[in-house]
Swiss-Prot record:
The gene is rplE. This is Large ribosomal subunit protein uL5. NCBIfam families: PRK00010.1. It holds the Pfam family Ribosomal_L5. This is one of the proteins that bind and probably mediate the attachment of the 5S RNA into the large ribosomal subunit, where it forms part of the central protuberance. In the 70S ribosome it contacts protein S13 of the 30S subunit (bridge B1b), connecting the 2 subunits; this bridge is implicated in subunit movement. Contacts the P site tRNA; the 5S rRNA and some of its associated proteins might help stabilize positioning of ribosome-bound tRNAs. GO terms for cellular component: ribonucleoprotein complex; ribosome. It comes from Helicobacter acinonychis (strain Sheeba).
Length: 181
């Protein structure tokens, strides 16, 4: 599953240079990293569930997940400093492209009534974030092994600081964006 990186090198770069009118190949936008994160919410107090969430994300990403801890105590949310509140994985290079290809080809088509991902997830600096409601769309996740059904946020960080260029890059890589009405 290393075809997406070669597709980027051979075809996407050429199309980006033409469409964005960029002469210097070093200035072409590229995908730098993908961050998969889960907030545990009400389940943050149960360490077994936290371990299960981290294990599930590790299976999906193919890399060990890190359990994130609260930086501050917040009485309204009943969170103390240092308490586990979620898990995340940062993917780069080969694993990043493998995950993206699996997401585009296998996982997103398994979502019920899928009409594309939202175009509104850009942050103004060339990064794109979208959410997935449940982890069962990934083939590595076995229904019997999960304790709690949870979603996840997927953030794609690009080398450009322009949303238009980042959108063009992700679209050419094959991300299925929703059609504009």
């Amino acid at each position: 599953m290393f075809g997406l990186k070669q597709f980027y090198q051979n075809e996407v770069k050429v199309k980006l240079a033409q469409e964005l009118d960029i002469k210097n190949p070093m200035l072409l936008p590229k995908l730098e990293k993908i961050v998969i994160s889960v907030g545990a919410g009400a389940h943050a107090k149960d360490m077994k569930i936290m371990q299960n969430i981290a294990q599930t994300i590790s299976l999906i990403a193919g890399q060990k997940a890190v359990i994130t801890k609260a930086k501050k105590s917040v009485a309204g949310f009943k969170i103390r400093e240092g308490m586990a509140v979620g898990a995340k994985v940062t993917l780069r290079n080969k694993r990043m492209y493998n995950f993206l290809e699996k997401l585009i080809v296998i996982s997103l088509p398994r979502v019920k009534d899928f009409r594309g991902i939202s175009r509104n997830g850009f942050d103004g600096r060339g990064n794109y974030t979208f959410g997935i409601n449940e982890q069962l769309i990934f083939p590595e996740v076995v229904y019997d092994d999960i304790m709690v059904s949870h979603g996840m946020n997927i953030t794609m960080v690009t080398s450009t600081d322009n949303d238009k260029e980042a959108f063009k890059l992700l679209e050419l890589l094959g991300l299925p964006f929703a059609k504009v009405r």
